């Protein structure tokens, strides 16, 4: 697959991208390098991995990171219940050593995302989502796996990759990532989309929604994001939800009343709702609200 073919595949997925993003994805894929994507929550980092899986016709294997994540949840664990049952059934077995060996065979091994991705016969897209939420110890373990594409399980031995996954790591920058991890990866930073890109996303994902309404929603979201009072900036997914909600109500014009009724699809906490009300009281200047004043 060349760069133009990759772009065509992404177009088929109705994914809006720029040349830089497409080029970085293509080169990382060709070199077999993991790709680290940073950016604020909701800018579409996870979507990149989903689109690549669809474009490459590969399975998407996702590891959602969180504080306290360890190898047993990310790599593998043993099916203790099944092992216990087997021990009970074979209580009178003569060859205890053989029984012990069998208990630590594939039959009792539960694959978690990392092991699944390297044992897969066909290459997968491995999404390691929000790596910044995991601790530094897990990051160091992950670095070893990404460097060697193999893993050692004490009871089994070293398992080498059957295929090399295309690895996408995302980070909201909750904590700094190690320089060692950064060196290992290609890097991409994704900003919130500008007005033109957001409108293109709305048109691509919601082609049935009135074009004028899409433009008003895109402009309103741009203004909400640039408003310093708003604590939680609307994500792209929330932009799409909002436009879909307005459309479901048969609304074709983003009036102050429509904005008030549907704000819960784009603003997700009480403080931001209150800030929106305060802005409206002074005359809302979002999207289709220009010129509307009410007290």
Regions found by a protein language model. Give the residues of each.
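C-terminal regulatory/interaction module of P-loop NTP-utilizing enzymes
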Residues: 1-295
């Amino acid at each position: 697959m060349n760069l133009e073919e990759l772009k065509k595949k992404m177009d088929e997925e109705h994914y809006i991208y720029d040349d830089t993003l497409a080029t970085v994805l293509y080169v990382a894929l060709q070199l077999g390098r993991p790709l680290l994507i940073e950016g604020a929550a909701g800018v579409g980092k996870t979507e990149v991995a989903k689109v690549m899986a669809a474009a490459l016709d590969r399975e998407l294997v996702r590891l959602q990171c969180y504080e306290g994540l360890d190898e047993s949840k990310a790599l593998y664990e043993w099916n203790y219940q099944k092992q216990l049952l087997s021990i009970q059934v074979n209580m009178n077995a003569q060859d205890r050593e053989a029984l012990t060996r069998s208990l630590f065979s594939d039959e009792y091994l539960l694959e978690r995302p990392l092991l699944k991705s390297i044992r897969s016969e066909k290459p997968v897209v491995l999404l390691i989502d929000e790596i910044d939420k995991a601790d530094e110890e897990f990051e160091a373990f992950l670095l070893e796996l990404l460097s060697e594409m193999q893993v050692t399980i004490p009871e089994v031995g070293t398992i080498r990759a059957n295929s090399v996954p295309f690895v996408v790591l995302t980070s909201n920058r909750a904590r700094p990532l190690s320089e060692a991890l950064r060196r290992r990866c290609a890097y991409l930073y994704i900003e919130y989309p500008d007005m033109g890109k957001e409108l293109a996303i709305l048109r691509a994902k919601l082609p049935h929604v009135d074009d004028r309404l899409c433009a008003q929603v895109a402009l309103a979201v741009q203004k909400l994001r640039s408003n310093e009072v708003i604590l939680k900036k609307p994500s792209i997914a929330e932009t799409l939800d909002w436009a879909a909600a307005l459309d479901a109500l048969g609304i074709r014009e983003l009036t102050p009343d429509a904005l008030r009724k549907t704000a819960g699809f784009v603003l997700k906490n009480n403080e931001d709702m209150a800030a929106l009300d305060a802005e409206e009281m002074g005359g809302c200047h979002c999207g289709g609200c220009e010129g509307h004043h009410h007290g």
